Design a protein with these regions (language model features):
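Conserved PLP-enzyme active-site core in the AAT-like
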Residues: 1-137, 141-159, 186, 247-248
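Short secondary-structure junctions
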Residues: 8, 156-163, 191-198
């Protein structure tokens, strides 16, 4: 739709990336900051350095990384960083671009119409979200850490193990002794858990999110699909999440 020809490359293998650049001579590159697959291990700064050395302009998708990392894409060598303000407790339909002044000025030039410009009230909502997000991320991370200790300490007998995964959002992967994942999810939503994200880490996500493993995680480990679920605490505390989990299991 944008008139682009897509070239794919494995960022986990810098040698292969260099070969792709030499062979295809791309005009630009898009790099996602957060990993998309369990086996992703690339270091963002190294990928961007490889692209920059070859003269390839780079844009990073910093969704789910902003406010959680020491440096976003443009601070690691990308020409521009982009992210959704909605995913930082901001207003719907507003994104942010940070980076090279010439790129930003060209974007501004395309937004000459009043209908396409961000209004003052939206800008203030973005600002409030940027202040609010790191605090809520820290609170949420604390809930996840405490839940991890409780579940691995035997708080729910049916739980085999729990780990924290940076699957874009930081979530708990909870594995059961028995293949009861689908039934737990069915019961959990009856007890107030969210069955689907409405815009991960948005201002609307208040109850905990109980949902199935992502497609990439299921592909990497198919047997886990029936025995494990994801839990994102959102704005909920560990007691609420444990209650929903226990009552869901008891209802099976």
């Amino acid at each position: 739709q944008m008139g682009l020809t897509l070239i794919t490359a494995d960022f986990n293998d810098l040698s292969a990336l260099k070969q792709i650049i030499e062979a295809q001579q791309p005009d630009a590159a898009l790099v996602q900051h957060t990993r998309q697959q369990p086996q992703d291990r690339y270091v963002l700064a190294d990928v961007l350095a490889t692209l920059r050395a070859a003269g390839v302009p780079a844009l990073t998708d910093d969704n789910y990384a902003v406010m959680k990392v020491a440096r976003i894409g443009c601070e690691c060598g990308a020409n521009v960083s982009t992210f959704s303000c909605f995913k930082l407790f901001g207003p719907e339909g507003v994104g942010a671009v940070v980076g090279d002044a010439d790129v930003i000025s060209r974007i501004r030039a395309t937004l000459y119409s009043g209908g396409s410009q961000i209004q003052g009230v939206q800008a203030l909502e973005v600002l409030r979200g940027l202040v609010f997000a790191p605090v809520m991320h820290a609170v949420q991370a604390g809930v996840s850490e405490r839940l991890l200790a409780l579940l691995n300490g035997g708080a729910v007998a049916e739980v085999k193990s729990a780990v924290i995964a940076n699957a874009q959002s930081k979530v708990l992967i909870v594995e059961f002794h028995q293949p009861i994942a689908a039934r737990v999810l069915e019961e959990a939503q009856k007890l107030g858990a969210l069955p689907y994200p409405v815009g991960a880490e948005s201002k609307y996500e208040i109850p905990p999110l109980f949902y199935r493993l992502s497609g990439t995680f299921r592909q990497a480990n198919p047997q886990l699909e029936h025995c494990a679920i994801r839990i994102n605490p959102n704005r909920s505390g560990e007691e609420t999440i444990l209650r929903i989990l226990r009552e869901s299991i008891a209802s099976i």
